[in-house]
UniProtKB/Swiss-Prot annotation:
Superkingdom: Eukaryota
UniProt-listed GO biological process terms: nuclear-transcribed mRNA catabolic process; positive regulation of nuclear-transcribed mRNA poly(A) tail shortening; positive regulation of translational initiation; transcription initiation at RNA polymerase II promoter
Comp. bias intervals (Acidic residues): 9-21, 232-245, 253-262
One GO cellular component, as annotated: RNA polymerase II, core complex
MF terms in GO: single-stranded DNA binding; single-stranded RNA binding; translation initiation factor binding
Species this chain originates from: Caenorhabditis elegans
Ranges where the record places region Disordered: 1-30, 232-262
Protein name: Uncharacterized protein F10E9.4
Amino acid sequence: MGKKKFIENEDGTTEVQETESEAPKDKKEKKEYRLRTLGANIKTSKKSFKEQFFMNYEDGLKLIKKMRGKGKGGQLVQKVMPRHISLPYHMSGKAAMEEACDWIAQNTVGKYRKEYKGIVVAVGSVDLASAPRVISDQYAFHTDVAINQIVFIPKIGDQYEAKVKYVQEGLMVGVVMDMITIHIKQNDKTSEDQVAIDDKILVKYSGIRIKSSLCHLKGEYVKMIEKAEIKEEEEVEDEADEETDVKEKVKEEEDEDEDMEE
């Protein structure tokens, strides 16, 4: 049944008309605005983000000892990073606050830290450095934490083992420690050794290219360490897709003009 509308005619009489009313909205439709994801689901994001990690904190500590034994101490170091964090009031509970701080810490993995001149490769425990506090009438509370990290600090002239991910004329792209991208300049030895994708090579570090907290290393080819095994047809197709992704990423990085070099 529609709504009644009273209309006054020219002769002074009043006429009643019924107007069609809109169909009632479904309850689910009314609450759609509540389902808009304005933020990140910490538990889901944390789980998917952890699957991308190539090194945990304990493995990082073992690798530090191993590198010290080889006389390469200082390339991989343990650091404690102080950080100020502000969180909304609905995360003021102990469990929620710990989850949030841990998630924030995990997002530093793979990022360049200017204060250390290195790249975070693993994150350990997050310790509370100060009690949560409220400032004026802000819609968030504040706290300070100490994040235990493993940081890779590259040094000019050092040589690192890298796995080749992409090869083109004049340039190769590889990863150091399976997570840090490095652009490798080719030379005469490259063609002699017939470097291909998934080969393990030795690279001489020559610099770093930084854009905000993102970065990639630069280096020159030194020698072949280990040739990759010959793969089956299905694996080759997957590799081709991965090579295409890397190629697009390299093109995007080359288009950046405002990068800072060290």
